[in-house]
């Protein structure tokens, strides 16, 4: 590889973190994974059964819950220092789930199985408490606004943080007027700006949804090609149709594109969106003709989490606290990377080698210079991302950098060269060579697009002469066999079962003891809570 010059700031920060007394800080980064997956029948139909009680209460179980649908599971690992332990934790949650799923399977890819009519796609249910009802009505609102089909897409969310001591160390050598908390938030927002610039690379390397079931787009205009079988649509050079404009799209959110110049402007833009009426939603109202709730409010966003983005600044919330309240009160604690497809060739949907690379990539985004995004840069970042998810493997594809065209492979190779010193530093801190190895694996994909997961999905479908559903079912069955033949130890199984039992008891206690407030009043108070925040 050609030797690319690193920025002065990146060099200085790497030298500081690489000092003997500071290197251990890189061992204290935290990694957490959330993996969504649909429950399906043995014949690849959406499971119509309720969330299995043996998995615990979705409202209160911290590791096994539901996302949009009663049939859409979400597995959540704790945030751990060693990513190998994070992946192992995710593996164990899968094994526990399979011990309780009977004949059902976990769907292997991000794009959903053939879905029933919308009325037969069950919304996740969280019981009779006011917070449980709020979560249910919020999901009814999502169905009203975007349709249920879109909400059945699954993904991997990757949570990453640097230790606070690392931010404090970096602050000492830099001219920053605010306090330690402000510097940390400022730095995470800078990370997010760089992520916006470079996240197209993750889509090329890890996108794994080049094809989908034709029913997903029923009644919608599209430019996909029919191939493999009558029920499969695809794009020949696509990396991630999940992250394309075929996935989540919203006219209401079209003008809501924070460019992450600082935490205040980010929280203000979201606060405005959850308080600003949007006429098409106003026309529908919050209740149907029978007086039943259909959405929490008629604003651009019902709640801040409705804003769909590839990465989010996050802060752990207290009970009853809203995400924006936590960010305003205590600043940014970590970032949540939300654009990763599930790899259908991997039982857990993500590998340790991928995790190692994401760590180095996100750390590069954190340590590299990050000027505020001008409007043309915001536009370029969005168009680059969209180009890669729809045709990232097209030979000779060009992206826009500084308003000039640049070959994808050239830019990708430059980025890997700049990420390499960070990978080396992570390896040095941990006494391994896995991060450098992960860089080599990614460079091979840049040199040969057939090695990318998206290309391998299409190659496997072609080799087996099968469409999207047959491929996905085959992978789902293979992963089910893996998990069912690798059960948890008796103690691990007992621990998960105890957690499930406790979660059911916690939900029952909440429903029995919560303050008697009618739901309309509860929703009103919840909405008012966001209007009272001051930065």
Swiss-Prot record:
UniProt KW keywords: ATP-binding, Glutathione biosynthesis, Ligase, Nucleotide-binding
UniProt KW Chloroplast keyword: no
Coiled coil residues, start to end: none
GO cellular component: cytosol
Pathway: Sulfur metabolism; glutathione biosynthesis; glutathione from L-cysteine and L-glutamate: step 1/2
Pfam name, any one: Glu_cys_ligase
Keyword set includes Amino-acid biosynthesis: no
Family stated for the protein in its record: Belongs to the glutamate--cysteine ligase type 1 family. Type 1 subfamily.
Organism: Pseudomonas savastanoi pv. phaseolicola (strain 1448A / Race 6) (Pseudomonas syringae pv. phaseolicola (strain 1448A / Race 6))
Tree of life domain: Bacteria
GO terms for biological process, alphabetical: glutathione biosynthetic process
EC number(s) stated in the UniProt entry for this protein: 6.3.2.2
Reaction catalysed by this enzyme: L-cysteine + L-glutamate + ATP = gamma-L-glutamyl-L-cysteine + ADP + phosphate + H(+)
Name of the protein: Glutamate--cysteine ligase
An example molecular function term from Gene Ontology annotations: glutamate-cysteine ligase activity
